[in-house]
């Protein structure tokens, strides 16, 4: 029996590839299952990174072969996949945003708060050294009182047409990081 965290990857698109590489490079983790409605993508990932593949995420949850899943599928699938993971007792790292309907997000938050599993969101900037330094200095009062916060973000290049169709574009997909950074630096809603 392995001491590695057994991870299922749900979604083999742009961010799924990033997660697959990270899992592959982590000596404490192994990719045991990949699921994507585009089964050829899942098959390719399984061939490249190991584990089984399927086009049905329910198979991943029923397998008993995952300790955690990374939800890297299109946004409209996130709530259902997180709910399925919680029901299966599987930990979750979900890409942002969870959903565009605040009612669904609130219901999921309540369920996640009472679950025995960890549900985390992919707000990676909170773990960036420079952002953490700013956060610490703000919290310690070294910078003073923040009265205005300007965040400028750029994507390295334009996203493809297929990606834009399911991602919601730059505003929904990337600007959410800026909102999270604003909350990270200034946790009080004004």
Listing of model-derived features with the role each one plays in the protein:
Residues 1-49, 183:
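N-terminal Rossmann-like dinucleotide-binding module
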Residues 44-51, 111-115:
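Short, conserved SAM-binding/catalytic segment
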Residues 33, 68, 148:
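Short, Asp-centered acidic motifs that coordinate Mg2+ and/or phosphate
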Residues 42, 81, 108, 134, ...:
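Aromatic/hydrophobic pocket-lining residues that form π-stacking "cages" and hydrophobic walls in ligand
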Residues 159-190:
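Rossmann-like dinucleotide-binding domain that binds NAD(P)(H)
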Residues 19, 51-111:
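Beta-loop-alpha module in the N-terminal Rossmann-like domain of NAD(P)-dependent dehydrogenases
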Residues 99-159:
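A contiguous active-site-proximal alpha/beta segment in oxidoreductase catalytic domains
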């Amino acid at each position: 029996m392995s001491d590695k965290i057994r991870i299922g990857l749900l979604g083999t698109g742009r961010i799924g590839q990033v997660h697959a590489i990270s899992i592959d490079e982590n000596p404490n983790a192994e990719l045991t299952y990949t699921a994507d409605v585009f089964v050829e993508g899942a098959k390719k990932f399984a061939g490249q990174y190991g584990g089984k593949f399927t086009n049905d995420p329910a198979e991943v949850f029923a397998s008993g072969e995952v300790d955690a899943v990374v939800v890297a599928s299109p946004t409209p699938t996130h709530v259902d996949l997180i709910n399925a993971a919680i029901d299966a007792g599987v930990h979750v790292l979900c890409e942002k945003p969870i959903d565009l309907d605040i009612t669904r997000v609130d219901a999921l938050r309540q369920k996640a708060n009472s679950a025995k599993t960890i549900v985390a969101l992919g707000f990676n900037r909170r773990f960036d050294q420079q952002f953490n330094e700013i956060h610490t200095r703000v919290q310690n009062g070294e910078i003073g009182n923040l009265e205005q916060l300007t965040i400028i973000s750029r994507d390295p290049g334009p996203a493809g047409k297929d990606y834009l169709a399911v991602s919601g574009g730059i505003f929904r997909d990337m600007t959410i990081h800026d909102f999270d950074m604003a909350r990270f630096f200034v946790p009080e809603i004004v």
